[in-house]
Regions:
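Generic detector of multi-pass transmembrane helix bundles and their immediately adjacent loops
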Residues: 188-260
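Interfacial loop-to-helix junctions that mark the boundaries of transmembrane helices
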Residues: 73-76, 138-143, 194-199, 259-260
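C-terminal ends of transmembrane helices
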Residues: 108-112, 155-166, 214-226
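Soluble N-terminal domains of membrane-associated systems
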Residues: 1-100
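Core alpha-helical transmembrane segments of integral membrane proteins
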Residues: 116-190
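Generic secondary-structure signature for well-ordered alpha-helical cores
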Residues: 19, 23, 40-44, 93, ...
């Protein structure tokens, strides 16, 4: 049986763990269960309240209610990584099943965090291929598929660069959607494709914030209504930003490109 860890050290670890889970794209209930599992193993009670930009974590000694710590942390904007979510969730079970000490748990956590959330090169190629495949699925011709593949390559690279520069997420969506839709428009204007509506409509599909939307539904279903509604509104704003970028492309063209 491991010695009960110091509450300050444990709270620091749980705050870092929660930050990693939320920024990787986890819904609220899963974060709460994993953090609660770890805290209970070390003999502490924990309460986590998650919002869109911040979260609050309170850790209390289950045998001495006067011993407690409360942190408010900002949630950094990170890449969605299902692999990291899975690894962090597995770590919480490993701590419980194998009885890891807090030092061992911190070492395992650092090992998970040392691995890149997503490999840029492989993500770039796979996302570009997937977006081009969607274009073909929706009836795009060969020219549209090529245009969308190239547009996605450029758009994903641009979005990655803007994120590295710390540009506001909404601005990222406006600029990226404008660039990818404009590349698709160039394909139409130069006669590379004859399915203009599919080309321009498909160009921004890779930007859809699907994970955020799904998480908002899960949060509402799990009675985390406040954060669920907040995430849904934030997702709607991002979709609106995408529409603004496409609108900027279509406005100066003075042509009815979308046959709808």
């Amino acid at each position: 049986m491991n010695a009960k860890p110091d509450i300050q050290i444990l709270t620091n670890f749980l705050a870092e763990y929660t930050t990693a889970m939320v920024s990787a794209g986890t819904y609220t209930a899963r974060v709460e269960k994993c953090v609660d599992r770890i805290a209970n193993h070390y003999g502490y009670d924990v309460s986590v309240t998650i919002f869109v930009k911040y979260f609050t974590i309170s850790v209390m000694d289950s045998q001495d209610n006067s011993l407690r710590r409360t942190y408010v942390r900002k949630i950094p904007l990170g890449q969605v990584s299902f692999n990291r979510i899975s690894e962090l969730s597995s770590l919480s079970w490993q701590i419980l099943d194998e009885g890891l000490s807090l030092d061992e748990a911190k070492e395992s956590f650092e090992g998970v965090m040392s691995v890149s959330a997503n490999k840029f090169a492989s993500s770039l190629i796979l996302i570009s291929l997937a977006n081009a495949a969607f274009c073909r699925l929706f009836g795009g011709d060969a020219g549209s598929v090529v245009c969308i593949f190239f547009a996605t390559l450029v758009g994903y690279t641009l979005k990655f660069a803007l994120a590295k520069m710390g540009v506001n997420l909404k601005v990222q969506y406006v600029l990226t959607s404008f660039v990818v839709s404009f590349i698709a428009y160039l394909g139409v204007s130069y006669g590379l494709t004859h399915t203009s509506d599919v080309a321009i409509g498909s160009s921004v599909l890779f930007m859809m914030p699907g994970v955020f939307l799904i998480n908002s539904v899960f949060d509402i279903l799990n009675d985390n209504t406040l954060v669920g509604i907040s995430r849904a509104i934030s997702t709607g704003i991002l979709i609106l930003c995408m529409a603004v970028g496409v609108y900027i492309t279509l406005t100066p063209s003075s042509a009815e490109l979308l046959n709808v």
